[in-house]
Structure formats: C-alpha cells, structure tokens
Amino acid sequence: MTHEDIVRSLLTYLRSVTACPDLAYDEAPTRMSGGFDATILRFSLQSAPDPFSGPLVLRLFQATATADRAPREGAVQNALAQLGYPAPSVFVAEARIEPLGGPFLIMERMPGRIVGSELENLSIKGLGQTLNILRQLPRIRREVLRLWDEAQTRLHAVPVKGFVDLVASAGVPPENLSFDSVFAAQRAFVEEFGLSGLRPAVDWLTANTPRQSTAVICHGDFHSSNVLADNGRLTGVIDWVKATIAEPAFDYGAVMAILATVPIRVPAGVHRMLRAMMNNLARTHSRQCGTTPETEAALRYYQVFNCLVQLVTVGKSHAQGNTTQGAYNSPVGVANLVNHVHLLTGLNLTLPG
C-alpha cells in the first residue's frame, strides 16, 4: 500500500471499529522515525470516543510478519501498562493483513522525545553542528545513563507472575515469551531459510548456556532510542517486539551488542570516537548486572545471541525478497555482526550471498 492508501484505509477501519461513520482526522497520519521492520505513523482523530480520543500511533507490520506478532506485542504492552510500567497502552491489535496490508497495532502516543536524541544530529547535520554536540556529550551521557538505568531497573522489578497472568488472560501463551522459546525459533529459522553459515553460532549457544539467575521481564532491544523522556522525566518505553522472560543479562548483553555493531553514519573524523563512547555507555549501563566472572560469561553469551538474531533477520529478509532496509540490512551491518561474534567466540559466520 502507498502512504495515501494506508491513511484512507486506516480511517475506514476506525470508522467501523468506533461505529462513527463521520469520524475524521484531527492530525493526519505522518511518519515517525524508527521502526525498521514496521511503518510507524502518528495521528489523532476529531471527537473520537474513548480510547481513541487522544494522540495515537499506528504500528503497521509487514505482510510477512507472523500472525501472533500484533496480539503478542499488544498483550505485553497492556500487561506492563496495567502493572504501572510506562509502556504504551494498545487499543487495537489486528492480526489480519486485509485492512492495511499487514498486521498492526493502534496505541496511545507517549509524551516526550527519544533519550539522547541529540546524537541523531551527528548523522544529519554538518560539521559545525556536530562539533557543538560533541562539546555537550558529557551532559548528554549523564542524562542518557540516568534515564536508561531508571527504565531498565523499573522493568526488571515488575512482578513476573502478575505479568504472566495478564499476558495469559489476553490469550498469549506465556511460554512463548521464554528465552528457550525465543532461541528455538531462531534455530528453526536458520534451518527453514537455509542459513547454514549461522549454525556455528547456534551450536556455540547450545553448548555454552550460562549459569541462570532469576528470570525477569526483559525488553530485548533496550537501547536509549526506545526510551522517551520529557524535561528529564521518564515518560515511556517503546518497541516491545523482542520482549522475553529471561535473566537480566539478556537485556544488558543485547545493549552491548547493539551499541558495538549498529552502523552509524557520522563524519569520518568522529566515527571511532562515537563508537568508543557508545561502547562505554553500554559497559557502564551493564554494570548494574554485576561484574562477577559468571555475569561476564552471561553478557558474552547474550551478545552472541543478539548478533545471531540480527543476522537471522537479515537472512530471512533476503530469502523472502524483502528489500526493506533494516538497521543491519547492509554489507556494513552484516560485517559488524560477524566481526563481533568472531571477537567474542572465534567463530566465522556467513550469510548466503
């Protein structure tokens, strides 16, 4: 669908859902940043009934998304919101692809802006603005760490049983959120899509399971771009596709892998410095997880797992002929992941050409 098709079809869908045939947009849908595997639009409606009366977000997945994706994310976010965590409440979790060309969520739009959003200017502004931001990095770093740590600590403190009960009551089997289930899905994808060059990572992860600590609710993609704040106050955490019940190192290891590997577009002179700063941020943030040898082994393990997930995502995309550009869907992105796994394990991974 084109953007215009989505805008028109969304309004038709909402008129049906609300039984308001004259429903109209107050703020027409416009694209928001992020969402490498989804189209994200912000909008609002005129004189709409609750719960559609406030600022809204459409999160539209690709047609190839699994049938359980929208219900799963909706159940996760609503359970967290009901337990007092700042996840956006979901008002519609549509599994069918017919209305908009893919499954989708309609949810509340959280106030605030992305934590550390000033860093985005490094990739879109000139050298003068870049140097100005570099002078502000110590302040930005302190603010990012404070809000990031708060969001992470609060999530890991959410009672797992209460969360599991709410997710189950929404019709989502809680066992589907376990790390074992998530890992099994990655193993299956490797075989289904002929990604034999990733089997060494699967074998390594199977043979090197770390000593387990108490399971908590994990986000799975908890970099600061998924954390929102307003005037120094945490207001929201978004993008729950990788939510998993696992030990805390699952989240911290994922962040370490992401900040070590995600491609960054910056002037050549600041690339190395920015990468070092990102790695330092991740390492500092991960200290909340502990510094014992067992913790270090777990962080290493979940870094490798996160890289495997990213590589599988790229491999699936290529196998399905999907040209949508994701964060790692480039030669540089794949090379960063492969090199990081080699650094951690000595393995040499490959993806089909």
Positions of predicted regions on the chain:
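Juxta-kinase regulatory segment immediately upstream of eukaryotic protein kinase catalytic domains
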Residues: 1-25
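ATP-binding pocket architecture of kinase catalytic cores
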Residues: 28-180, 184-197
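Active-site acidic catalytic loop and adjacent metal/ATP-binding pocket
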Residues: 33-45, 52, 90, 155, ...
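C-terminal/domain-terminus segments
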Residues: 163-182, 298, 302, 313-315, ...
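Active-site activation/catalytic loop segments of kinase-like enzymes and analogous catalytic loops
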Residues: 250-291, 305-324
